[in-house]
Amino acid sequence: MSIVKIKDKTFKTSIPEAEILKKVQVVADRINKDFEGKKPVFLAVLNGSFIFAADLMRMITIPSEISFVKYASYEGTSSTGSMKTLMGINQNLAGRHVIIVEDIVDSGFTMAHMIEELKKMNPASVEICSLLVKPGNLKVNLDINYAVMEIPNDFIVGYGLDYDCLLYTSPSPRDKRQS
């Protein structure tokens, strides 16, 4: 088991890279099938989703577009419950099929906020594609049709997920050790 220390926390490998990539391919195959002929727009939520979005987009075989948005709702390891838009949507999405690409759906507040904003733009559809989902921690009702995997309510770093803005780019996510 590989262990890494970031600031004051210690993390251990929780999901091997090969397992993630295999499951990302399964989700990409579903999206390719479900959106064939629809030219979806992928909206990747920065910073955490950038590695997942890159891997996913390499597996997408249908014509599509990608754009990026950035929100802030975390301080350290905790969600603040409030949402700050740091980089918003600057594209006409009317009549388009939109797929939000997120690193992790925890409380669901970021996704609920994004969906509310997107609906004002009259898209044909809005779907959520998340690398990780914490179903036991969801505070809002969301339809997450493209989840790579569900995890318990652990704090995870790696594969683009950060701890207090300190990025850990290990290809395998790690969860916080109890110490």
Regions found by a protein language model. Give the residues of each.
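Short glycine-rich phosphate-binding loop at a beta-alpha junction
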Residues: 38-46
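PRPP/pyrophosphate-binding module of the type I phosphoribosyltransferase fold
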Residues: 84-157, 161
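Active-site-facing substrate-recognition patch
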Residues: 1-39
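Short secondary-structure boundary/capping segments
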Residues: 3-5, 12, 34, 58, ...
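A generic "structured core" feature
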Residues: 30, 43, 51-88, 98-99, ...
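Conserved small/polar residues in nucleotide/adenosyl-binding loops
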Residues: 168-175
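Residue-level signature of catalytic and energy-coupling elements of molecular machines
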Residues: 20, 42, 159
